[in-house]
């Protein structure tokens, strides 16, 4: 009986020690690594896959260029390059930093993408930025920025949706038939161009500057300290 009791006590000690060790190691496993950009920029080139949507996240800058190279150029700090993810799935081209890296500071990551004539949506989040150097054309187009991201683009479409949230910023020149605009949580949208019809919904200290965006038929709904400046040449409904 004494021998059995001794084994039980030792086993209990081993379990306690193992549990303590896991608790110490867990933060690096759960929260990943942090990397500071070296400042030494290197370049990598890959073949451009088929895509019709561009998504950028985690402070990555994406530039859409009119150069028909068929290639995507990635510029990044040499100690961050291996963690830059540029891939296409289901027509969605994503440029971001690998999830294994929890925090990136002083990084400079720019992904240059050729305009392939099929892009119909731009989505930027988490302090990322998308800039189009050419006018993008599609039947239906979507622009969405969130979490301090920024999008600068020119679009021609039959219909267009523009959405900004969480302190993001959109600056767009748009020529469209029908447009839906929405912003919240201190986001800002600046529009130029024209639309036949436009529906606008602004809330929570968001701001729309559209004095240079002429609309024939416009409805505007603002709430919670939001502001909207519009240029309506015909019917205007405001709440």
Give residue ranges: language-model regions.
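Intrinsically disordered, low-complexity terminal regions
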Residues: 1-239
């Amino acid at each position: 009986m004494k021998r059995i009791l001794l084994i039980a006590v030792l086993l209990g000690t081993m379990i306690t020690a193992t549990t303590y060790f896991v608790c110490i190691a867990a933060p690096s496993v759960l929260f990943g690594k942090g990397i500071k950009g070296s400042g030494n920029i290197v370049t990598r080139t890959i073949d451009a896959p088929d895509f019709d949507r561009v998504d950028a996240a985690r402070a990555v800058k994406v530039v859409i260029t009119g150069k028909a190279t068929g290639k995507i150029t990635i510029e990044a700090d040499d100690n961050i390059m291996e963690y830059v993810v540029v891939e296409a799935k289901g027509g969605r081209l994503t440029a971001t930093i690998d999830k294994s890296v929890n925090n990136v500071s002083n990084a400079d990551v720019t992904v240059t993408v050729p305009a392939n004539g099929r892009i119909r949506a731009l989505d930027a989040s988490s302090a990322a930025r998308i800039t189009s150097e050419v006018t993008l054309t599609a039947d239906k187009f979507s622009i969405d920025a969130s979490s301090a991201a920024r999008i600068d683009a020119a679009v021609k479409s039959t219909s267009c949706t523009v959405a900004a949230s969480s302190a993001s910023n959109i600056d767009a020149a748009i020529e469209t038939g029908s447009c839906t605009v929405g912003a919240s949580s201190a986001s800002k949208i600046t529009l130029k161009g024209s639309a036949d019809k436009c529906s606008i919904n602004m809330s929570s200290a968001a701001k729309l500057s559209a004095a240079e965006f002429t609309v024939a038929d416009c409805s505007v709904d603002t709430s919670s300290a939001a502001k909207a400046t519009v240029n309506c040449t015909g019917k205007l409904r405001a709440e």
